[in-house]
Amino acid sequence: MSDTNTEKPELVSLNKLSEMRTNIGMVKRYWNPKMGFFIEPERKHNNDLLKLDLQYQALKTAYNFIKDVVKNHGQILFVGTKNDYVKKLVIDIAKRVNVAYITQRWLGGTLTNFKTLSISINKLNKLVEQQKQNANDLTKKENLLLSREIERLEKFFGGVKNLKRLPNLIVIDDPVYEKNAVLEANSLKIPVVALCNTNTNPELVDFIIPANNHQPQSTCLLMNLLADAIAEAKGFETLYAYKPDEQIQIEIPPKQERQVINRSNTRNITNQRLNINRQQQETL
């Protein structure tokens, strides 16, 4: 006789969260006192530590809420414009679970002036359709100009071109960096799910996930787990949710070395250019 009371595996283990450094906060001097409830008394080096048990509870709450939004046919928008890694991560996630995304600079009024945004989206969709239907009738120059305009619009609106109405939920990797998006969502009472580091004002976020949003492995794990809620609600395979630790493999990008500027060489080049300019003037 099979055991019908077998418990579902945990969403993600605390060991995996710790391994991915999801609980490493920012340096103490950057902390927001309103995040104090989520912070451990001790620190690691000079960084605050976030409470893993509270992080896990918050993650599960947000996960279940996202599932409910999807099951009720709500639209979800992922936002991440902070750096190249986050942009690529958000694009990959959004395409995996088929939701809208914004990875370019947040344009003021994206939510609060959605009618204007819709005009740009409609223009993009019409131009794409026009290029498909009239590709053979356009001259080479006309086709080039049309492609450039589509590329320009695609850059800013490509991720939201299927968004027919305001989203029912916004998922953000860094509410401090994406403050304008958070404030617009707040003004329209659109719920916000966000990874909140120790420098965040949690009062601006509806579903707070106290977490390290400054390191790639942490951001990758947590944002993908939130996307897995969408995948589960749609009947897709999850990437990380409910998987054993050994199946969760996250590639950590190498740190980019800082370029050291040799100021003496810079001065020499500048002086050489000045000498060349003087010589040119003397020959005139």
From Swiss-Prot:
GO terms for biological process: translation. InterPro entries: Ribosomal_uS2, Ribosomal_uS2_bac/mit/plastid, Ribosomal_uS2_CS, Ribosomal_uS2_flav_dom_sf. Keywords: Ribonucleoprotein, Ribosomal protein. Gene3D superfamilies: Glucose-6-phosphate isomerase like protein, domain 1, Helix hairpin bin. One of its GO terms (molecular function) is structural constituent of ribosome. One of its GO terms (cellular component) is cytosolic small ribosomal subunit. Pfam families: Ribosomal_S2. Belongs to the universal ribosomal protein uS2 family. PANTHER family: 30S RIBOSOMAL PROTEIN S2 PROKARYOTIC AND ORGANELLAR, SMALL RIBOSOMAL SUBUNIT PROTEIN US2M. This is Small ribosomal subunit protein uS2. The lineage of its organism: Bacteria, Bacillati, Mycoplasmatota, Mycoplasmoidales, Mycoplasmoidaceae.
